[in-house]
Amino acid sequence: MSGWMTRRHGLQALAGATLAAWSTPWSAWAQGAAAERRTSPTPRLVSVHSSLTETIYRLGAQDTLVGTDTTSTFPEAAQRTRKVGYMRTLSAEGLLALQPTAVLATDEAGPPVVLAQLRQAGVPVHLVPSTLRFDDVLAKVRLVAQLTGREAQGRALVAQLQAEWHAVQAQATSPATPSRAGAPRVMFVMAHGGGAMTAGRDTSAHAMLQLAGARNALEQVQGFRALNAESVVLAQPDVVLTTTESLAFLGGAERLWQQAGLSQTPAARHQRLLAFDGMALLGFGPRMPSVLTQLQRQLA
């Protein structure tokens, strides 16, 4: 923790030094952009996370969107919005060029110096904590509803999601549901452009498995790790969970089973493979309760 805090303080110091070094032309440009934003009759929002973008569309507030990050691929209309890059590697110039009245993001967004530049230019940056809990979903709905003036729609969506969430909890605690000791051992495998990875504790995949009442076959591992045959064979997963994007990248289910050690598992012998849209499964957005319901059914 102390190392993380040291890195964070270092980034904050860097942000301050960078802001102090801004040239007069940059400051003048930023002030001009801020003046144009103040005359905008409706919100001009940039959404930097798929879950926030989905929430904006669910509330019917897509007319307020002027840009999204590259994780925002659902609904399909979001793919046609102006893109500001990946959420962890944002550019102040690219964001400010869209003249946003606010930027919505999770606390995973960055780098910190860019967020500081946006605030210095007069653009409010709203960050939602990523705690990997259902509360994250509701916090995103409430923030979007407030910023877009869709409070009534927001309250309705919160009520709907809470009802879905209660159904998930009821299923997880049902006498018909196996106890944790008897729950299936599930291994999450992801390959979105590089080598295949598996997920241990403190990951969104681990959180979703716990919420669904399953056991993470790699719960003794911290974070994401490269898939390797030894750990897979030792874990002996009953089920492999992946994303549809991973299947597409690897070339289908047959190619996935050929990954390190997977062919030697109970999951491969019984061909128990589940695949979901990546951001629906891992993004903690408004699709989360329905995905958990599907996951529970398919694991039963």
Model-derived regions: residue spans:
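Short secondary-structure boundary segments
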Residues: 49, 107-108, 130, 221, ...
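Short helices/loops that flank or line small-molecule/ion binding pockets
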Residues: 92-99, 228-236
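A ligand-binding cleft/hinge motif common to bilobed small-molecule-binding domains
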Residues: 109-120, 241-257
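N-terminal export signals
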Residues: 2-4, 9-30
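C-terminal segment of N-terminal export signals and the immediately downstream linker at the start
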Residues: 25-45
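Extracytoplasmic substrate-binding proteins
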Residues: 38-44, 113-197, 214-220, 239, ...
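His/Asp/Glu-enriched short active-site or ligand-binding loop at hydrolase and phosphoryl-transfer sites
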Residues: 199-225, 244
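A short, structured surface patch at a secondary-structure boundary
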Residues: 44-98, 102-114, 253, 262
